[in-house]
Regions:
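Conserved beta-strand segments of alpha/beta enzyme cores
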Residues: 25, 56-58, 102
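Donor/substrate-binding cores of folate-linked one-carbon enzymes
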Residues: 21-22, 32, 81-201
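N-terminal Rossmann-like dinucleotide-binding module
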Residues: 1-42
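N-terminal glycine-/serine-/threonine-rich beta1-alpha1-beta2 phosphate-ribose binding loop
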Residues: 36-78
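Acyl-group handling in specialized metabolite and lipid biosynthesis
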Residues: 203-216
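A residue-level signal for conserved active-site and pocket-lining positions in enzyme catalytic cores
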Residues: 7, 29, 52, 82, ...
Length: 300
């Protein structure tokens, strides 16, 4: 079975490594074009491209699939199936129609929940206790395909989005390998249509979401800090200074929203609209990440 892999970030690289290790015949890899990064604006390969190069797999990096030339380049690979994980590119219908067995996507949510670009982050922001990954048959509508199979994982009360993603990457790799094995053995991998009444969306995160609103409940503030970590990171202002807030926990306490209730051995206690949170780790603008008590001992 001839497989073309499409993906870009770390979660995709984890899945890519797994199906390479499992011995699938991968005839090509599609990933986003190299991008300039860092102070020197040096061109950087995507994690998926790094894996492809290390395993001598041909790499293709089109900006899009609008041109006939790009589409025919994919067709020439004669894929039986395309495995797509966080590619970051829209696939038009004429691309979806190329593989004889279709395109299979691994999405980082339990579909139909959280269709869109930031599924696991919104699961944490919304305070969910469980999330997972879904394997779906790709259709033109975003994340709307029939669901073939899922893997689930709990979300701990202090888990960050980044920590959840690490687990989802491993689960996604297992799920992709399992579905490809079924397809290789002749299974059509029929899926279940998504219930339209249960559809929710996970729009892209942006920095406008970062400032903490202390009138919210302690749980909501804590979920904001967890869901926006490691990017774009929640922020607060204190004594005229701006801080990134890397870690909090919900604690007992009451006061006016935003009122400083005290500095403990483990953090800075701040009142919310309901309850309080303890800021455990923060980062002053231009500074490094520190335990809150350590920072305030040096900045009384």
């Amino acid at each position: 079975m001839r497989v073309v892999f499409m993906g870009t970030p770390d979660i995709a690289a984890t899945c890519f490594k797994r199906i390479i290790a499992d011995g699938f015949e991968i005839v090509g890899c599609y990933t986003q074009p190299d991008r300039p990064k860092g102070r020197g604006m040096k061109m950087v390969y995507s994690p998926v491209k790094e894996v492809a190069i290390a395993n001598n797999i041909p790499v293709f990096q089109p900006e899009n699939f609008r041109s006939d030339e790009v589409v025919e380049e994919l067709r020439a690979l004669k894929p039986d199936i395309c495995a797509v994980v966080a590619y970051g590119r829209i696939l038009p219908q004429r691309v979806l129609d190329i593989p004889t067995c279709g395109c299979i996507n691994i999405h980082a949510s339990l579909l139909p929940q959280y269709r869109g670009s930031a599924p696991y982050q919104w699961a944490v922001l919304d305070g969910l206790k469980e999330t997972g990954v879904s394997a779906q048959h790709m259709v033109l509508e975003m994340d709307a395909g029939d669901v073939i199979d899922v893997e689930k994982t709990p979300i701990g009360e202090n888990d960050t989005a980044g920590e959840v993603l690490d687990r989802l990457a491993v689960l996604g790799a297992e799920l992709l390998s399992r579905v490809l094995t079924r397809a290789k053995n002749g299974d059509k991998c029929c899926g279940t249509p998504q219930c339209k009444e249960d559809v929710t969306f996970a729009p892209m995160l942006d920095k406008s979401m970062c400032p903490i609103d202390w009138t919210k409940t302690a749980c909501q503030v804590h979920n904001q800090v967890r869901g926006l970590h490691p990017w774009p990171v929640a922020t607060m202002e204190l004594q005229g200074k701006k801080f990134k807030v890397h870690a909090t926990r919900v604690v007992e306490g009451s006061g006016e929203p935003g009122e400083i209730l005290g500095l403990t051995k483990t953090g800075l206690k701040i009142a919310c609209g309901e309850g309080a949170v303890e800021v455990i780790q923060l980062q002053a603008e231009g500074g490094k990440r520190m335990a809150a008590p350590d920072y305030f001992r040096g900045h009384p």
